[in-house]
From Swiss-Prot:
The keyword Nucleotide-binding applies. The record marks R28 as: Transition state stabilizer. Mg(2+) binds at S130, E162. This is Galactokinase. HAMAP family: Galactokinase. One of its GO terms (biological process) is galactose metabolic process. GO terms for molecular function: ATP binding; galactokinase activity; magnesium ion binding. Catalyzes the transfer of the gamma-phosphate of ATP to D-galactose to form alpha-D-galactose-1-phosphate (Gal-1-P). It catalyses: alpha-D-galactose + ATP = alpha-D-galactose 1-phosphate + ADP + H(+). InterPro entries: Galactokinase, Galactokinase_bac, Galactokinase_CS, GalKase_N, GHMP_kinase_C_dom, GHMP_kinase_C_sf, GHMP_kinase_N_dom, GHMP_knse_ATP-bd_CS. It is found in: Cytoplasm. Its EC number is 2.7.1.6. GO terms for cellular component: cytosol.
């Protein structure tokens, strides 16, 4: 049963009438451009065919009822007439409440709604299950009540809800790609202007995500440290962000910087350049060059930004040994565990899967999870 069929059937059973709309919003993977977002730089994600699906209908009062199919059909209910506050017990409900509250704060006028939510974006894998939920809820209200919001505004509203209501500091990339993703394309995003450019993906190439299943522990504290080091670097160059520093300017004075800060800055500057070049390589179908750029990105994250772990490096090496120069592989996400992403010719996917199955657990003692994805369409009706 598809997520659409599941949520529609649950909706009818729970609320006693059929849903009028079914909306989806996808998760995402970032192909290249790591830790560049908060430096006002470039990222190159694509939406994936794992999504959050919501069957819904407008109500003629001011009540919101939400059922979470993936959490034992837990039901949350609140009124649009009262101040929206956090739910004491259901963390999932706070993503919904936060999005609704922030849409209200943006002076949008809408009535009540019934929703049933289900999703298959793996949680805790760094594939943006929370952003896909936020964008799906925003799109539900936009569609049901014809709100004058475009995808970028729905994305910004989701980011605001996550930062201010849920209390998790995130950049804009995850929500933006979920809202604006395009089938068979990745999206080059300028994190300063929020300008986007759709980049066609080469035919016959699979987007493979492999979760190391190594639980990230340092990610919060180390993420903040990296952010501070980047800000220190930008101040040294008297610029608002590292986006504004050229590699030539850096090379001329690198020796004057604290050595650790210098390494962090070098990663950001080279990663930004790689990301822009990667968009061109993909557009030209140059998988060999894309693979080189992904390898350079991984080495930079490992040696200059120091955010990889042995489990991740091992996974990358296993995949690289199979694909050679026929594709690319690197760590993706915040670091210290999580996932790797690979662009692989479809005919090589079984060999990669077999090599990883035979070698990773034997070397590391943890079983990986393997996802084969297609670059998918952003949020909308399904």
């Amino acid at each position: 049963m598809s997520l659409k069929e599941k949520t529609q059937s649950l909706f009818a059973n729970a609320f006693g009438y059929p849903a009028t709309h079914t909306i989806q919003a996808p998760g995402r993977v970032n192909l290249i451009g790591e830790h560049t977002d908060y430096n006002d730089g470039f990222v190159l994600p694509c939406a994936i065919d794992y999504q959050t699906v919501i069957s819904c209908a407008p109500r003629d009062d001011r009540k919101v009822r939400v059922m979470a199919a993936d959490y034992e059909n837990q039901l949350d209910e609140f009124s649009l007439n009262a101040p929206i506050v956090a739910h004491e017990n259901y963390q999932w409900a706070n993503y919904v409440r936060g999005v609704v509250k922030h849409l209200q704060l943006r002076n949008n006028s809408f009535g009540g709604v019934d929703m049933v939510i289900s999703g298959n974006v793996p949680q805790g894998a760094g594939l943006s299950s929370s952003a896909s939920l936020e964008v799906a809820v925003g799109t539900v209200l936009q569609q049901l009540y014809h709100l004058p919001l475009d995808g970028a505004q729905i994305a910004l509203n989701g980011q605001e809800a996550e930062n201010q209501f849920v209390g998790c500091n995130c950049g804009i990339m995850d929500q933006l790609i979920s809202a604006l993703g395009k089938k068979d394309h990745s999206l080059l995003i300028d994190c300063r202007s929020l300008g986007t450019k759709a980049v066609s993906m080469p035919k016959g190439v699979a987007v493979v995500i492999i979760n190391s299943n190594f639980k990230r522990t340092l990610v919060g504290s180390e993420y903040n440290t990296r952010r501070e080091q980047c800000e220190t670097g930008a101040r040294f160059f008297q610029q608002p962000a590292l986006r504004d520093v050229t590699i030539e300017e850096f090379n001329a004075v690198a020796h004057e910087l604290d050595p650790i800060v210098a390494k962090r800055v070098r990663h950001i500057l080279t990663e930004n350049a790689r990301t822009v070049e990667a968009a061109s390589a993909l557009e030209q179908g140059d998988l060999k060059r894309m693979g080189e750029l992904m390898a350079e990105s991984h080495a930079s994250m490992r040696d200059d930004f120091e955010i990889t772990v042995p489990q991740i490096d091992t996974l990358v090496e296993i995949v690289k040994a199979v694909i050679g120069d026929k594709g690319g592989v690197r760590m993706t996400g915040g670091g210290f565990g999580g996932c790797i992403v690979a662009l692989i010719p479809e005919e090589l996917v079984p060999a990669v899967q077999q090599a990883v199955a035979e070698q990773y657990e034997a070397k590391i003692g943890i079983k990986e999870t393997f996802y084969v994805c297609k670059p998918s369409q952003g949020a909308g009706q399904c």
